[in-house]
């Protein structure tokens, strides 16, 4: 039990590293004051540009992957689950930023990348197919998340892994609640639109 608690804390701390926020600070910009207010890759793209966004996404994937790897290495199967889920939650709710972070898509993808790289790639492809005609990145993120969940159930993955991927999807969908409302209304921001200062 102590091992699980330890790797959960480790996962949270890794996940809570606010890469997008730090990228903005290097340029004197607080990305939380623009666009969606999130610190993840999409808002960084709209606020700081593609290179900063690419770096942010790769780091967010990396911290999820590292948390999952260390969790499993130190505490086995359920360590993978605990560290992976807490990394995702840490990304979305970092204590350092008063629990205002990103939306956990890249970090959750990094977690699942440890055991299911093909499923993640298929999820990315499915997400891209949703983005191309709509230019709604949020719709792509939601589609990718759902695609990975479905694949793990079709693959009859271990119960612990299926529970984890469902939990990660719940985090992603909760964090995209406002996006989903805008998608339903047809008012969601489209790819290529620059972030505006928040009121």
Curated annotation (Swiss-Prot):
InterPro entries assigned to the protein according to its UniProt record, in alphabetical order: G3P_acylTferase_PlsY
Primary location group: membrane
Keywords associated with the record: Cell membrane, Lipid biosynthesis, Lipid metabolism, Membrane, Phospholipid biosynthesis, Phospholipid metabolism, Transferase, Transmembrane, Transmembrane helix
Catalytic reaction list: an acyl phosphate + sn-glycerol 3-phosphate = a 1-acyl-sn-glycero-3-phosphate + phosphate
Subcellular localization(s) per the UniProt record: Cell membrane
Matches recorded under PANTHER family: GLYCEROL-3-PHOSPHATE ACYLTRANSFERASE-RELATED (PTHR30309:SF0), INNER MEMBRANE PROTEIN YGIH (PTHR30309)
Subunit structure: Probably interacts with PlsX.
Cited function: Catalyzes the transfer of an acyl group from acyl-phosphate (acyl-PO(4)) to glycerol-3-phosphate (G3P) to form lysophosphatidic acid (LPA). This enzyme utilizes acyl-phosphate as fatty acyl donor, but not acyl-CoA or acyl-ACP.
Protein name, per record: Glycerol-3-phosphate acyltransferase
């Amino acid at each position: 039990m102590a091992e699980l608690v330890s790797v959960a804390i480790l996962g949270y701390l890794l996940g809570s590293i606010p890469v997008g926020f730090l990228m903005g600070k290097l340029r004197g910009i607080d990305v939380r004051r623009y666009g969606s207010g999130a610190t993840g890759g999409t808002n960084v793209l709209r606020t700081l540009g593609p290179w900063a966004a690419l770096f942010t996404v790769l780091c967010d994937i990396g911290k999820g992957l590292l948390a999952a790897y260390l969790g499993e290495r130190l505490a086995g199967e359920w360590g993978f689950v605990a560290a992976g889920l807490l990394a995702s939650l840490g990304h979305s709710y970092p204590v350092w930023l008063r629990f205002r972070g990103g939306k956990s898509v890249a970090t959750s993808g990094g977690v699942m990348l440890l055991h299911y790289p093909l499923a993640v790639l298929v999820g990315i492809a499915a997400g891209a197919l949703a983005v191309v005609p709509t230019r709604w990145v949020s719709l792509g993120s939601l589609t990718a998340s759902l695609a990975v969940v479905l694949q793990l159930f079709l693959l009859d993955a271990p119960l612990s892994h299926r529970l984890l991927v469902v939990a990660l999807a719940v985090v992603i969908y909760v964090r995209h609640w406002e996006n989903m409302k805008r998608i339903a209304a047809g008012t969601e921001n489209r790819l290529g639109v620059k972030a505006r200062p928040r009121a």
